[in-house]
Every structure is written in C-alpha cells, then in structure tokens.
C-alpha cells in the first residue's frame, strides 16, 4: 500500500481522530486528507506530473506533512530537504534532486528564514516576473517555489 493510500484508509476509518498534534494546531485524519487532496490538485494544476520531484523545505509544520501526502497523491516523488542546508549545500541538493516545484514556509523560528536562504541561493527569485515559470540556470528544472502561507515576495507563489 502506498503512503497516500494509507491516509485514505485512515480518513475513512477514523475521520474524527487526531492525526497530527502540533503545539498550536491539530488535524484529524479527515482534515489531513482533505488538505492533502487540495494540495495534490494544486500540484497537478501547476504541471507536476507522475515521476516529477517535489522538494519540501520547512520546519515541522502540518503543511509539511500535508505536502508529503499531496505529492504522493499527485504521483510525484517527495524530496524532503534538510532544514539546516544553506548556500552551496542547498543549491546542490535542489539541482541534483531534479526538483520541479519546491514547497517552503515564510515562518521564521529565530534561526531559519527559508525565503532568504533561497533568494541568496537563487537571486533570480527576487526579480522573477512569472513565479510559476522560473528560469534558474543553476536549477533548470525548478519552475516554482510555493510558500505555505500568503506571501507578497517576488519569485514565490502563495499556496493559500
């Protein structure tokens, strides 16, 4: 059974039971399934196809888990990225992983600002006129960077 199929079964058997518990939020299996399905449809709408690689660069958040399930539902491969990567490490793993779309967060824990790290790695993000069709020489397959939250940052798409 694939990962996304496990969520479908869990949502059917225990729709109102807690699937995720975070300090500031909880999600039931039904909520997790609905959120993951919505993200999966968005991935497909963004052109992600079966076999594509979707990166996830984030703190431990409900959206992180939703993105893993959504990526599997869309038939793509989730590529969780180490939140401690910076500069050359981050650039290398994004390019070497053939990531087409990258989920990230603007949430800042006092140590990590992912949008700043990504903009440092890829200055093209700060001038991108069409953030759904990025053209980054050092990451030629990367077409979109999607923030979990609403954002006004150039080069980033809001998932909300």
Per-range role (PLM):
Residues 8, 16-61, 65-69, 86-91, ...:
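Conserved AMP-binding/adenylate-forming core of the ANL superfamily
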Residues 1-2:
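Absolute protein N-terminus
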Residues 13, 66, 137-140:
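A generic fold-level signal
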Residues 46, 76-159:
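Structural core segment of the AMP-binding/adenylate-forming
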Residues 11-16, 145:
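A short, compositionally biased
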């Amino acid at each position: 059974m694939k990962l996304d199929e496990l969520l479908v079964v869990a949502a059917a058997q225990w729709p109102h039971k807690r699937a995720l518990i975070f300090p500031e939020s909880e999600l039931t299996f039904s909520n997790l399934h609905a959120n993951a399905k919505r993200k999966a449809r968005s991935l497909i709408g963004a052109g992600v196809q079966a076999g594509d690689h979707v990166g996830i660069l984030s703190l431990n958040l409900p959206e992180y888990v939703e993105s893993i399930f959504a990526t599997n539902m869309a038939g793509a491969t989730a590529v969780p990225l180490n939140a401690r990567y910076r500069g050359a490490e981050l650039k290398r793993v994004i390019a070497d992983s053939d990531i087409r779309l990258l989920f990230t967060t603007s949430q800042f824990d006092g140590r990590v600002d992912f949008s700043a790290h990504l903009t440092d790695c890829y200055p093209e993000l700060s001038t991108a006129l069409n953030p759904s069709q990025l053209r980054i020489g050092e990451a030629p397959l990367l077409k979109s960077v999607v923030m979990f939250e609403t954002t006004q940052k150039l080069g980033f798409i809001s998932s909300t």
